[in-house]
Swiss-Prot record:
Subunit organization: Homohexamer.
Protein EC: 1.4.1.-
GO annotation, biological process: glutamate catabolic process
UniProt protein name: Glutamate dehydrogenase A2
Enzyme class: oxidoreductase
Segments forming a coiled coil: none
Pfam families given in the database record: ELFV_dehydrog, ELFV_dehydrog_N
CDD domains: NAD_bind_1_Glu_DH
Length: 416
């Protein structure tokens, strides 16, 4: 059985929510398609003197609520369809947590593990030059995503600033603190996932001190989530990377796992725990499964065998639409990605505000604001879920996001 791709999944999720909201047909049609997508070819001189050309994209999905906001990812599977879906999800995410942003996403088709630091820098600067007429502190503000980091954002900011003739730190978020980044941004997505997981346990009357948690992915998001949940008393029984997963039913020592990964290039292979496959991890009998890797890992086949009590989506689009239907039929709650991983864009917003005001906040204030916004959005989702008798948490979240986006279009009208 061939399952739908990320863009089809996103549109199907919208369609499910439409039944519960009153949206003008014309506005709904506008919300289904990106406002614009740029495709660029990036010639880069490699370290050996050869020239390689990379395909890249920037999709701007919707700007009714404010400037476009969304990350830049480097991965071999990047495609126009993928960035369009991710830009759409970012639109609903910013609306759900009530940030004054729209949604965007960019990406370069490449394998950064096969590139030197110099080649990645040249590729980043070439990409920035290619999209610089689209981005800006009041138009489109990029951020890190898969395989990009604060250093990458520093190169984007510097390249854009050179063209402007002065420093423009607010053109990107997720920068190093030394050039205008905010403390707490690197950990923000994982911290947000841990906050939402705590709220989810409380809602379903699960004691976090007795909770078993499996996390697919041990990159920036998965590792921070594991560390923070472990600090709160949760039992992290499995984590994974691209080589496979490690499992200990008595609970992994997350600090030790992190130290091992740091010493082995981020790899978990060889760690002193039971090696299992990523598929095995996804079907463990746990209180919470947290997919924190890539899209479409929970397929129909996985959903039929899944034994977790609840899923908290740390990755973007980890559950296919058809798999979500299976989980709904089985009564397995899924806390959607547009809420669970919104911590990153919330703190990106706080960084952008600080840059615009030229006034910095301490990390305690940033984390307080993050928690307040996430718990508020979680409560709003629950109110919609219960009061409107909506069948899933995802659809409840989408009703809020669609209503806010549609209201913005309604007030702004159509020009000309």
């Amino acid at each position: 059985m061939t399952e739908s791709g990320p863009l089809e999944n996103m549109l199907a999720q919208m369609e499910q929510a439409r039944e519960y909201v009153d949206i003008d047909d014309g506005i709904y049609e506008r919300l289904k398609s990106p406002e614009r997508t740029l495709s660029v070819s990036l010639p880069v001189r490699m370290d050996d003197g050869s020239v390689e050309v990379f395909d890249a994209y920037r999709c701007q999905f919707d700007s009714a609520r404010g400037p476009y906001k969304g990350g830049i990812r480097y991965h071999p599977t990047v495609s126009e369809e993928e960035v369009s879906a991710l830009a759409g999800w970012m639109t609903w995410k910013t609306a759900l947590v009530d940030l004054p942003f729209g949604g965007a996403k960019g990406g370069i088709v490449c394998n950064p593990k096969e590139l030197s630091d110099n080649e990645i820098e040249q590729l980043t600067r070439r990409y920035t030059e290619g999209i610089r007429r689209m981005i800006g502190p009041e138009t489109d503000i990029p951020a890190p995503d898969m395989n990009t980091d604060p250093r990458t954002m520093a190169w984007v900011m510097d390249t854009y600033s050179v063209y402007q003739g002065y420093a423009v730190p607010e053109v990107v978020t997720g920068k190093p603190p030394e050039i205008g980044g905010t403390d707490g941004r690197v950990e923000a997505t994982g911290r947000g996932v841990s906050i939402i997981t705590e709220e989810t346990f409380e809602y379903f009357d699960t004691d976090i001190q007795d909770a078993d948690v499996a996390i697919q992915g041990f990159g920036n998001v998965g590792s921070v989530t594991a560390d923070l949940l472990s600090e709160r008393g949760a039992n992290i029984v499995a984590v994974s990377d691209v080589t496979g997963a490690i499992h200990d039913p008595t609970g992994l020592d997350i600090a030790d796992v992190q130290a091992y990964a740091d010493a082995n290039g981020g790899r978990l292979e060889g760690y002193d725990a039971e090696p299992i496959s990523n598929d095995d991890l996804l079907t463990l009998d746990v209180d919470a499964l947290i997919p924190a890797a890539i899209e479409d890992v929970i397929t129909v086949d996985v959903a039929e065998r899944l034994a977790a009590d609840v899923i908290v989506e740390a990755a973007n689009g980890p559950t296919t639409f058809d798999a979500a239907q299976v989980l709904s039929d089985r009564g397995v709650p899924v806390v959607p990605d547009i809420l669970a991983n919104a911590g990153g864009v919330i703190v990106s917003y706080l960084e952008w505000v600080q840059n615009s005001q030229q006034y910095s906040w301490d990390v305690e204030e940033v984390n307080r604001d993050l928690r307040q916004r996430l718990t508020g959005a979680f409560d709003e989702m629950l109110v919609a879920y219960e009061d409107r008798n909506i069948p899933t948490l995802r659809t409840a979240a989408y009703t809020i996001a669609l209503e806010r986006s549609a209201d913005a279009h309604e007030f702004r009208g159509l020009f000309p």
